[in-house]
Amino acid sequence: MRIIEGGLDDPRVVALLDIHVTRARGETQRGSAHALDVTELKGADVTFWSAWEGEEVVGVGALRRLTAEHGEIKSMHTAEAARGRGVASALLARIMETARASGMTRISLETGSWPYFLPARAFYARHGFIECGPFGSYRPDPNSVFMTRELGLP
């Protein structure tokens, strides 16, 4: 598997992001979905990666800089056929490595509180994330779970 920075102009990446956004918004109450679309992922404060096996995109993920010391994981998604093969772990490792290298000391995320999002919450917990309160521009929301992790040594 290779992970490259970028890919937002590739229709295969856009198709996988469309699946991610559609599912995330479909499983969340109106007003509580925070998935970024392609235009937002192209923002100056966002670094985006795509994971590939051969010519097939198998995962995506992004890091949004909130402050000099704090980043947010966005748009993590693994293609259905590639689940269980370490794609998400590899993307998360790249995101955390980049965050550390840029001086961030904390990385956080927002995911849903509904059963559909349970695998995501379990994944992040396995990687050292703990639940926390809202951060950045988020507000308390019963449909959201906020998680964070200090970026000490890998």
Language-model features, listed with the residues they occupy:
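A generic structural signal for beta-strand entry/edge sites
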Residues: 68-70, 106, 144
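Acetyl-CoA-dependent GNAT
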Residues: 1-74, 79, 92-93, 98, ...
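Glycine-rich phosphate-binding loops of nucleotide-dependent enzymes
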Residues: 129
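Conserved GNAT acetyl-CoA-binding A-motif
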Residues: 99-112
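Conserved beta-strand-loop-alpha-helix junction that forms the acyl-donor binding cleft
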Residues: 80, 109-120, 138-142
